[in-house]
Curated annotation (Swiss-Prot):
Protein name: Cliotide T16
Domain observations: The presence of a 'disulfide through disulfide knot' structurally defines this protein as a knottin.
Cross-link Cyclopeptide (Gly-Asn) mapped to chain: G1-N30
InterPro entries the record matches: Cyclotide, Cyclotide_sf
Keywords in alphabetical order: Antibiotic, Antimicrobial, Disulfide bond, Knottin, Plant defense
Amino acid sequence: GSVIGCGETCLRGRCYTPGCTCDHGICKKN
């Protein structure tokens, strides 16, 4: 749920930062 350490825009649901998941177009961690 946090964008700290993530926050990248995720295209096609893919995040390149380890441990981050795509949530409504933004990569988030927990």
